[in-house]
Amino acid sequence: MKQYLDMMRHVREQGAVKTDRTGTGTRSVFGYQMRFDLQQGFPLVTTKKLHLRSIIYELLWFLNGDTNIKYLKDNGVSIWDEWADESGDLGPVYGYQWRSWPAPNGEHIDQISNVLAQIKRNPDSRRHMVVAYNPAFVDQMALPPCHAMFQFYVAEGRLSCQLYQRSADIFLGVPFNIASYALLTHMFAQQCDLDVGDFIWTGGDVHLYNNHLDQAKEQLDREPRPLPQLQIRRKPASLFDYEFEDFEITGYDPHPHIKAPVAV
């Protein structure tokens, strides 16, 4: 994950000093891109241990169209707790926009199902896109989507994905987002009988919080280790039928976890 460490180093050393919504303060750059060849390993950061359970269950939660944290909490995942209301609701966040984008005629658009069908039917289309950032609903969301939109691309039998992330918390958020969308690409590829290609991560406001600078230095001082491999144990009948137990990561030998506060 040299690409990720290079980005962290660049922002830590060259980033502009900025204020932010949380009052924490950041070092920030505008516009950065990384590319990961998914044939060369699963892009899971090795310079600190990530909680893979949270990454997988969150993605399954998104794909279910769910916006209440009960499913996450029932499965030991707490990453959305700080933003939920007293009943566990987050408003019309990712899952709602992915699976039930409101149409002007009162119906709803299942973007995920539409894109999956479109890839199978017309792989060369330039319209394989899913958008989570719906301006009409931003004020109703507990947290507006940071990873705002993604696009698939098919060439030579391989499926690639590019994510645009409007707001990128380098230390805590970005490693999760890279792994999540890499996993999503593998799932789509399996359902479409394609190999995986590249995952391209594109960031807008790419930042390190001031209370993550010491942790970033600790991580930068560590030597990256070989990437693990992802194995999907079965091919479900539907993209929406995957379960946590279907995914196996082998060869993941990370450095120890580094604690850091979440900016809420």
From Swiss-Prot:
SUPFAM superfamilies: Thymidylate synthase/dCMP hydroxymethylase
Active-site residues, record numbering mapped to chain: C146
Binding site for dUMP: R21, R126, R127, R166, S167, A168, D169, N177, H207, L208, Y209
Binding residue positions for (6R)-5,10-methylene-5,6,7,8-tetrahydrofolate: H51, D169, A263
Location in the cell: Cytoplasm
A Gene Ontology biological process term: dTMP biosynthetic process
Gene Ontology molecular functions: thymidylate synthase activity
Organism domain of life: Bacteria
A Pfam entry, by short name: Thymidylat_synt
GO cellular component, one term: cytosol
Alphabetical keyword list: Cytoplasm, Methyltransferase, Nucleotide biosynthesis, Transferase
Signal peptide positions on this chain: none
CDD domains: TS_Pyrimidine_HMase
Catalytic activity: dUMP + (6R)-5,10-methylene-5,6,7,8-tetrahydrofolate = 7,8-dihydrofolate + dTMP
Pathway: Pyrimidine metabolism; dTTP biosynthesis
EC numbers: 2.1.1.45
Stated role: Catalyzes the reductive methylation of 2'-deoxyuridine-5'-monophosphate (dUMP) to 2'-deoxythymidine-5'-monophosphate (dTMP) while utilizing 5,10-methylenetetrahydrofolate (mTHF) as the methyl donor and reductant in the reaction, yielding dihydrofolate (DHF) as a by-product. This enzymatic reaction provides an intracellular de novo source of dTMP, an essential precursor for DNA biosynthesis.
SUBUNIT field: Homodimer.
Family, similarity comment: Belongs to the thymidylate synthase family. Bacterial-type ThyA subfamily.
NCBIfam families xrefs: PRK01827.1-3, PRK01827.1-5, thym_sym
PANTHER family: THYMIDYLATE SYNTHASE, THYMIDYLATE SYNTHASE 1
Protein name (Swiss-Prot/TrEMBL): Thymidylate synthase
Source organism of this protein record: Hahella chejuensis (strain KCTC 2396)
Phylogenetic placement of the source organism: Bacteria, Pseudomonadati, Pseudomonadota, Gammaproteobacteria, Oceanospirillales
